[in-house]
């Protein structure tokens, strides 16, 4: 998918830039950032991030600045309308998900409920 198409999940410039830097450190240009949702955390669901060099059937791939964000169909249904960003601050540096579908989130923001 390209930057010109309305996407169900936004991949910010800051996140794409950080992914590009991390991938260059790994010397594997096939790596993509995978965002996923699993059961757990104090609010019921939690976000996860990993680098993956494959795209599975049904996965959505969002490309920006020469790197890709990959989301499986199950996770995507909970993330529609959200964004994946990267931030650096007093709490450290991390990828964050802004999710308009989350009814409540825990204090650290890493888990949520629908």
Swiss-Prot record:
Disulfide linkage: none
InterPro entries, A to Z: FeS_biogenesis (IPR000361), FeS_cluster_insertion (IPR016092), FeS_cluster_insertion_CS (IPR017870), FeS_cluster_insertion_RrpA (IPR023063), HesB-like_dom_sf (IPR035903)
Cofactor field: iron-sulfur cluster
GO molecular function: 2 iron, 2 sulfur cluster binding; 4 iron, 4 sulfur cluster binding; iron ion binding
Signal sequence interval, chain numbering: none
GO terms, biological process: iron-sulfur cluster assembly
Record key words, sorted: Iron, Iron-sulfur, Metal-binding
Residues annotated for iron-sulfur cluster binding in this entry: 42, 106, 108
Co-factor note (free text): Binds 1 iron-sulfur cluster per subunit.
Pfam families noted in UniProt: Fe-S_biosyn
GO cellular component: cytosol
Record-stated family: Belongs to the HesB/IscA family.
Assembly: Homodimer.
Record's function text: Required for insertion of 4Fe-4S clusters for at least IspG.
PANTHER family reported for this sequence: IRON-SULFUR CLUSTER ASSEMBLY 2 HOMOLOG, MITOCHONDRIAL
Protein name per Swiss-Prot or TrEMBL: Iron-sulfur cluster insertion protein ErpA
Gene that this sequence comes from: erpA
